[in-house]
């Protein structure tokens, strides 16, 4: 990670604190990983406060593959099996089967329908029978221990939601450029400035958890 590019947003602890404040206010933040890993930035929002305009932004500005990051406990409670039994993905991204709300949606693909699906899934009393499969929202199972166990966007998202006082469930989608290529750090920073978003790295969260928690 080119730390010098991020210093304009403060030091590691300041960036995390700014991100947590924005999340507490229902705003999104941009989370980047190491250049030697995926080298991508994800736009993330708290799952329990996601709005239709925010979902539309995720669909419009990002890859369109909107993911719901959940704890292993929640994944089991919802009866979500892993998408594949043998995960050969380079970074072992833990996709479960996709989901749709059983009620309150049409085709499931619109911004409003995806919000309905997410708000249904993150309810404390949501049961497996409240969801159907396949769907247009893609749950990801975070590893226990968060970024200290796996330095991924999934774990970073769940960690940030916990630290912000939410239930440990968040939305992420990878930021892309207008031509469809993946946004790298310079483009991610420009996007953050344009939309007045906080940016932080997974390494920032690791440092924060080691020092503060």
Curated annotation (Swiss-Prot):
Subunit structure: Homodimer.
SUPFAM superfamilies referenced in this protein's UniProt entry, alphabetically: YrdC/RibB
Residues that bind D-ribulose 5-phosphate: 37-38, 42, 150-154, 174
Cofactor note: Binds 2 divalent metal cations per subunit. Magnesium or manganese.
Binding site for Mg(2+) 2: 38, 153
Record-given protein name: 3,4-dihydroxy-2-butanone 4-phosphate synthase
Keyword rRNA-binding: no
Organism: Clostridium botulinum (strain Langeland / NCTC 10281 / Type F)
GO CC entries: cytosol
Listed GO biological process terms: riboflavin biosynthetic process
Gene Ontology MF terms in the entry: 3,4-dihydroxy-2-butanone-4-phosphate synthase activity; magnesium ion binding; manganese ion binding
Enzyme Commission (EC) number: 4.1.99.12
Higher taxonomy: Bacteria, Bacillati, Bacillota, Clostridia, Eubacteriales
Keyword Lyase: yes
HAMAP family: RibB
């Amino acid at each position: 990670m080119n730390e010098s590019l991020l210093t304009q947003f403060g030091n590691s602890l300041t960036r995390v604190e700014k991100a947590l404040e924005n999340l507490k206010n229902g705003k999104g933040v941009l989370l980047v990983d190491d250049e030697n890993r995926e080298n991508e930035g994800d736009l993330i929002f708290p799952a329990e406060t996601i709005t239709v305009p925010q979902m539309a932004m995720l669909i419009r500005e990002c890859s369109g593959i909107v993911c719901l990051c959940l704890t292993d406990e929640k994944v089991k409670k919802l009866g979500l099996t892993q998408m594949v039994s043998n995960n050969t993905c380079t970074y072992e991204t833990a996709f479960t089967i996709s989901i749709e709300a059983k009620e309150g949606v049409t085709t499931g693909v619109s911004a409003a329908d995806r919000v309905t699906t997410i708000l249904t899934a993150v309810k404390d009393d949501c049961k497996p029978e409240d969801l159907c499969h396949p769907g247009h929202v893609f749950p990801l199972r975070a590893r226990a221990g968060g970024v200290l166990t796996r330095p991924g966007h999934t774990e970073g998202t769940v960690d940030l939601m916990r630290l912000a006082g939410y239930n440990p469930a968040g939305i992420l989608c990878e930021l892309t450029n207008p031509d469809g290529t993946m946004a790298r750090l310079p483009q991610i920073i420009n996007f953050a400035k344009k939309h007045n978003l906080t940016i932080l790295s997974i390494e920032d969260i690791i440092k924060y958890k080691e020092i503060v928690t």
